[in-house]
Every structure is written in C-alpha cells, then in structure tokens.
C-alpha cells in the first residue's frame, strides 16, 4: 500500500486527507505538515488513522513515504519540490502556477530525470486536457475566460495596485486581460487552470487569460477556446466553489483525489 505525505492542511488538503482516510482508498496518509500547527492538529483530529505531524516542510521528504501531495501554495512548491525529488519521492503539485517560472520548471524536470521520479499535475478545475495534449504540436492559439464571484477573487495580489473595488461591482465586469504568465503571479490562488493550459499547450506567454468578476454567479466558470491545424476545441466548465474556500472549485479537489487513486492503483488506466 502506498504511503502519502501531505503538505498543506487547509481546505483542499483536508478534503484530500479525508478521502485517503476512507475505507476504500488504496493508500495510507502517514505524515502531514502545515505552517500552522493548529491546522495540522485540526486535520489529524478529523481522521480515523492519525498521521504524524512533522516539524518542518523539508522533513516530509525524508520520511518513509512514496509521494508528497502539495496543497499549500506556489511558494511551498518553490521551497520544497526539489528536495522531495532529490529524496527519491514522487510529488503531486496543486499550485501549478509555480511551474510557469521556467527556471523552476527546468530544475524540477532535470531532477525527475536524474532521480527517476515523477511529478503529477492533476487536471484540476477544467476538462479537456487529454484532448489538448493530443493536439499540442498543432496548437496555434488558446484562450481561457474565467468567471467568478468577486468574493472568490478577494486577496489577489492584482487588487493591491488596481483601482477596481470588488465590493462595488454590481454586474459582470472584466477585471483582467493578459497572459497566463502574468496572471499566475497576480492571481496565485485563483488561476491555476491557466497554468495547466500553458504547460499542456503553447506556453504561458501565448496563452490568453481573461478574468471576470460577476456578483450574480454562484459558480466558478472556465470557458476555453483552442484552435490550430487540427481544427477547433471549445469547452465550458461550470464548477461549484468549495464550501470552505470559494477560490477553489470542488472539481479541483476531486481531480486531485482521482489522480492519487490512479497513482496508487495497478488496474486499467483511462485517458491520454
């Protein structure tokens, strides 16, 4: 049975942990870490099988585990990812925006080759990545329009220097237009989907991102358009926001859980 360590005990990390702790999950959660010891302790109290709480993030990768699941932040990825691979552990990353820093991506890619380990990036809050992977060499353009309630965008770095006041928005309003590379730094907790599209497709500087704040929606909606020699693809995903963290879609959490199940299973695998 696979042994899993969890980095990040917030809303997403908690729900991943609860899934692993269920009777039908083919793995064991053995270690957890969060910057907040209270968050780590609170999580363990919800579990039947109590994982060990480690004292710092770098201790996770030195434990007798198979994979570290990151559900914390882009900074956590930058701080810990390399040591996980160097300690010959696999890694699943939810804060995918960190990988749009080309130096980090290249270092981690080289480390995976050197240490024969794998980094897993769940498809998160969008669908259609299998199709995009299949036509990657023929892609010419790709764009994503993300629509969320203003409260789901609060706290984003973008609004520190913007004149836009989210509390004053009364109708659907475009708050950002630009590249995925810029978007993941300005909206680090909101737009991991753009990072995934960039890594799957034609890169972060060629992936167009539009972010819309709509006080009349109760969904996190992603509309994706891609075109090239293969033809065109258009798909729209309307996600229910996580009840504890509206910045995150329920689908992103379910995607992480399913990716872990696939990692821990040796049965028939579906998809590209």
From Swiss-Prot:
EC main group: oxidoreductase
Catalytic activity: L-aspartate + NADP(+) + H2O = oxaloacetate + NH4(+) + NADPH + H(+); L-aspartate + NAD(+) + H2O = oxaloacetate + NH4(+) + NADH + H(+)
Record-listed E.C. numbers: 1.4.1.21
GO terms (BP aspect): NAD biosynthetic process
Family matches, as SUPFAM superfamilies: Glyceraldehyde-3-phosphate dehydrogenase-like, C-terminal domain, NAD(P)-binding Rossmann-fold domains
Pfam family, one: NAD_binding_3
UniProt pathway: Cofactor biosynthesis; NAD(+) biosynthesis; iminoaspartate from L-aspartate (dehydrogenase route): step 1/1
A GO MF term: aspartate dehydrogenase activity
Active site: 222
Role of this protein: Specifically catalyzes the NAD or NADP-dependent dehydrogenation of L-aspartate to iminoaspartate.
Record-linked HAMAP family: NadX
Recorded family membership: Belongs to the L-aspartate dehydrogenase family.
Other noteworthy facts: The iminoaspartate product is unstable in aqueous solution and can decompose to oxaloacetate and ammonia.
Descriptive protein name: L-aspartate dehydrogenase
Organism name: Nitrosopumilus maritimus (strain SCM1)
Gene encoding the protein: nadX
């Amino acid at each position: 049975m696979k042994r899993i360590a969890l980095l990040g005990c917030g809303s997403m990390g908690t729900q991943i942990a609860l899934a692993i702790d269920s009777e039908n999950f083919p793995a064991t959660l053995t270690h957890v870490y969060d910057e907040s010891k209270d968050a780590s302790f609170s999580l363990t109290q919800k579990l039947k099988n109590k994982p060990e709480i480690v004292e710092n993030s770098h201790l996770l990768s030195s434990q007798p585990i198979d994979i570290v699941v990151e559900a914390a932040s882009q900074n956590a990825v930058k701080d810990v990812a390399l040591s996980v691979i160097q300690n010959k552990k696999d890694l699943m990353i939810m804060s995918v925006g960190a990988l749009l820093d080309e130096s980090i991506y290249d270092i981690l890619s080289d480390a995976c080759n050197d240490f024969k380990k794998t980094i897993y990036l769940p498809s998160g809050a969008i669908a259609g990545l299998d199709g995009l992977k299949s036509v990657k060499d023929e892609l010419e353009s790709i764009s994503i329009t993300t629509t969320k309630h203003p409260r789901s965008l609060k706290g984003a770095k973008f609004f520190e220097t913007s004149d836009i006041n989210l509390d004053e928005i009364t109708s659907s309003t475009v708050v950002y237009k630009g590249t995925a590379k810029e978007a993941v730094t300005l909206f680090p907790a909101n737009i991991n989907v753009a990072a995934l599209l960039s890594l799957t497709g034609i890169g972060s500087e060629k992936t167009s991102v539009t972010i819309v704040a709509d006080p009349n929606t109760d969904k996190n909606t992603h509309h994706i358009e891609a075109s090239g020699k293969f033809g065109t693809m258009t798909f729209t995903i309307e996600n229910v926001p996580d009840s504890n963290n509206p910045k995150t879609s329920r689908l992103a959490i379910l995607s992480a859980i399913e990716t872990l199940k696939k990692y821990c299973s040796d049965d028939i695998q579906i998809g590209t």
